[in-house]
């Protein structure tokens, strides 16, 4: 009964207005009140401020400044093996695995459409049919900048307007095509591992989605699909990003979906649903290397995994695995 009520609220509540209100409040300078809110947030979600370049919460003028806080360089060492792709975000893996023709796993027993995720772009979808996907959820406690899994040349970006459903266990199980319905920014790259899509998905109270090459993509929310393209290679106007480099960010966060072409990468064996991710740790390895790299994410302290799972609404998935 309670879950039915919560699900009904997802359809009834004015999610756009709640999101605008959250974005407005998070951008305001409120002095001691801003610090109080940040301190309460840090305590409730067990945010590790020792990792931040500015660990003192008084140094943030707005909640948004705190939310997109940069980390100290040394806390996320990058795996430098050229055959290894790295994790794009701190968070928890929601689902991962093979794309079955047009089907991507959303939750246990529930799929959604690859082509719908890509805004009906069947040519782009053809690049990834029977490929590999990884869906990473960023909880409120996480670092909310998104990084490149490998070197890439930006070729296309599509802004897709949509709903702003919350992303959690309940909605994943009950909202059909959740990620193909929510607002999102699709970024397509040429890489040495074939085409790669990195998709930043919005949700309720995600105030904005930004990229390093174009700034704020949303808001404004104009209700129309927008598309940009860039030249290949070293042509004038091309955008090249390096492995581990920041490519975007959420102001209040949500989900990152990565799509890889078929036969190009193998996901690291240790990864599974609910694995905790840290940027620049191994995510996948090339299928074209003669010697498979010894790629394995560094072990995390038990208290870090527990804190991440406590902050993630995806942990209810454990009930399905008993």
From Swiss-Prot:
Localization: Cell membrane
Active site positions, chain numbering: 90, 147, 254
InterPro entries according to UniProt: PS_Dcarbxylase, PSD-B, PSD_type1_pro
Modified residues (Pyruvic acid (Ser)): 254
Broad class of where this protein is predominantly found: membrane
Family: Belongs to the phosphatidylserine decarboxylase family. PSD-B subfamily. Prokaryotic type I sub-subfamily.
NCBIfam families, sorted: PS_decarb
Protein's name in the database: Phosphatidylserine decarboxylase proenzyme
Taxonomic source organism: Shigella sonnei (strain Ss046)
